């Protein structure tokens, strides 16, 4: 699908005349990460669009870092809605896809009917460029800081793609040095499912996804005009009980900023990859919430 000047690989499910729902994946994932959600949503009557985001899988991966800024990514999402002929759509995202869903709803509220984030809550604009704050409070080894230097994280992550994708640890400078740590297939993936990711990232590398993180300060600069804007659409937030993101991005950061948060739940026994780890409760929450927003 040609949108916003690039080709995106997009899977479609459900009736062509159903309400449009766009599922936005995170890093290091693909549209494939929503495989447990697409059929239940389609069976409930929704037209489900599932892209590989720019820089991932079968989609184009522009070279320039600034081509992955949040306003550019949001226009990709608008292009998907335009393709579907939808004035509005519901956005559901996980990890970086959650940030993209929230920010698209924030930047273009007239195009987003409802918005859901998994693992990553909406965070209001920081008082200063966030990368400096991360360096000060979380250190140079914090994964987002470690991702900044072009080529460094790529070399470490691409050294053994299977180990990278199978590891349960957050990638950071210390992880890169610990090359002998075991990396069994995660319990929520079959070996064949893991191989889908391995094949895709062996082909594409990790640069596209890393470039999302390299725009953090640029995103801060480009969102100054909407800094005080609230997200007023019907919203949902789900996080896993064992998700490490809760330690530095708790749901409470949304207080006063997401004004119609209808669902805010912690999924027991789930970690960061909750839509793959615990699809049944995730799907139940999504379907009930979607019914409220139809």
Name what the model sees in each region.
Residues 1-7:
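N-terminal cap/lid segment of alpha/beta-hydrolase-fold proteins
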Residues 2, 12, 50, 239, ...:
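Conserved residues in the N-terminal Rossmann fold of short-chain dehydrogenase/reductase
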Residues 7-8, 20, 56-92, 96-262, ...:
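Flexible "cap/lid" subdomain of the alpha/beta-hydrolase fold that forms the substrate-access gate
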Residues 9-60:
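Conserved HGGG/HGGXW glycine-rich cap/lid loop of the alpha/beta-hydrolase fold
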Residues 26, 69, 277-278:
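Active-site helix-initiating loop/hinge in glycosyltransferases
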Residues 27, 31-34, 96, 102, ...:
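Signature tryptophan residues that serve as conserved aromatic anchors
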Residues 261-294:
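Catalytic active-site module of serine/aspartate enzymes centered on a nucleophile-bearing elbow/loop
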